[in-house]
């Protein structure tokens, strides 16, 4: 098994909104950080509905902004249309929302990450190296290991993602992209990471 030359303080798994925020804020604070994504070209790619804002997400974007995050900045630079939702109701439920250009948002995010000097590695993390209840590294699908002191998992909907077409189930993320099959130990049977059960 080959190991990376560099030891990182933090490895962030996944290059969506959460992964970018976690990696950039750690990097800005002087933490030696590596962002791992299954596809470098998909870092910053948004979901099917490329909207930033709304009642719940809008509040979150503002809080991320206050804490030094970057999502709102990327959204401002890639906005196609802005609108205040619920104008016919009381002010307490008014909420700004922007429809963004998906491709432009992605391009801006990748350019900014490069300018900041954040290390990005293309690969798929399949398990965590845990010794004495501490993370020592992450194992990639190609058999290599990235040594680190901590890891943040931001796999989102890609973590063990399934697409249902009729009675068929396919492991997948967004259309045309594969899902992330991540385990907490080298043996998939030992302790599979999965989504939390929905409370019905």
Model-inferred region functions:
Residues 7, 24-131, 150, 154-178, ...:
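Conserved N-terminal/central alpha/beta ligand/cofactor-binding core
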Residues 19:
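N-terminal Rossmann-fold NAD(P) dinucleotide-binding loop
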Residues 6-16:
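Beta1/beta-strand and adjacent pyrophosphate-binding region of the FAD-binding site
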Residues 130-144:
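Conserved beta-strand-loop-beta-strand element in the redox core of flavoprotein oxidoreductases
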